[in-house]
Amino acid sequence: LRPYLTQMGEYENLYYAAPNLYCIVKTIYYTEAGQVNEGHLRMLGKAFTLFGLGATGIAMIFFHRKKFPVNEKNLISTAYFFALFVPFVLPYMHERYFLLSDIFAVLFVFSYPKKSYIGVATMYASLRAIAQNPFHSDFDNKLYMGLVVLAAIVCLAGVLKKEIFLRETPQTPRSLPLSGSENE
């Protein structure tokens, strides 16, 4: 956490080719002259840093307290959610911070074939962001790619809700009856 907080002052832009929340926010804050009010964006950056850290902390506490079945699919979807959510809401992120979410997206596609559009969408947005560097091209659809990742996060939250929180967990009885003692 400390390296992230010290690097916040080193960078001026709220995002560096990463398809995150600031692609969307920066588009909203354009003025009529085409200039961006950087002071407002920096304040938003600090606010979203607190929001991102707080939301992640609350979600981690909720996951810790919620009794849900621990299996490979649940672990993959939960890890994928956090690997995608954290660089999406934190400011000053480069596109390379989405690499972990790309890895979990591949695992998610194989674990949930019917929901593979979520993983494909995030990998596409990440690839579009990464592809600008070797070809020295401008990432022209930053807003749209940010919206694609936002939609993927919402869909992934729906998968988590369905798979983890709405699924009935088997109830263990408080005490097991001894054989034959119940009938006597």
Name each region found by the language model.
Residues 87-95, 109-112:
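Short, contiguous acidic/charged loop-to-helix segments that flank catalytic cores in large enzymes
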